[in-house]
UniProtKB/Swiss-Prot annotation:
Residues given in the record as Fe cation 2 binding sites: 58-59, 74, 78, 107, 112
Disulfide feature: none
SUPFAM superfamilies associated with the record: Hemerythrin-like
Family: Belongs to the hemerythrin family.
Subunit structure: Monomer.
Protein name: Myohemerythrin-1
UniProt cross-references to PANTHER family, sorted A to Z: BACTERIOHEMERYTHRIN
Function: Myohemerythrin is an oxygen-binding protein found in the retractor muscles of certain worms. The oxygen-binding site contains two iron atoms.
Pfam families recorded: Hemerythrin (PF01814)
Keywords (A to Z) from UniProt: Iron, Metal-binding, Muscle protein, Oxygen transport, Transport
Tissue: Muscle.
Residues involved in Fe cation 1 binding: 25, 55, 58-59, 112
Length: 119
């Protein structure tokens, strides 16, 4: 597995080379960071769910348009993560924050990196 950056911010090692997706990934990092900074904030959790939903929709639309071969399992990973987020309520616990941090890092560097140059 890939290391979790500390502080938890996007850096160049996460670049997928599609500016819109890189910008959205930065927003996901910020969303998780904000939830970690104030685990009692329902607003931060809602914001994270909203930006994640929007990003997944945009990324999946690009994969569909490009007829990307791994779109089905990729969409399932998105669906599973959103289901997990949707089941959460503030206050969050450290285990949940750690899960979200790790999921995002591993997903981008393992799964998203497979579509580099293919969308």
């Amino acid at each position: 597995p890939f290391d979790i950056p500390e502080p938890y911010v996007w850096d160049e090692s996460f670049r997928v080379f599609y500016d819109n997706l890189d910008d959205e990934h930065k927003g996901l990092f910020k969303g998780v960071f904000n939830c970690a900074a104030d685990m009692s904030s329902a607003g931060n959790l809602k914001h994270l769910i909203d930006v994640t939903t929007t990003h997944f929709r945009n990324e999946e639309a690009m994969m569909d348009a490009a007829k990307y071969e791994n779109v089905v399992p990729h969409k399932q990973m998105h669906k599973d993560f959103l289901a997990k987020l949707g089941g959460l309520k503030a206050p969050l616990d450290q285990g949940t924050i750690d899960y979200a941090k790790d999921w995002l890092v591993q997903h981008i560097k393992t799964t998203d990196f497979k579509y580099k140059g293919k969308l």
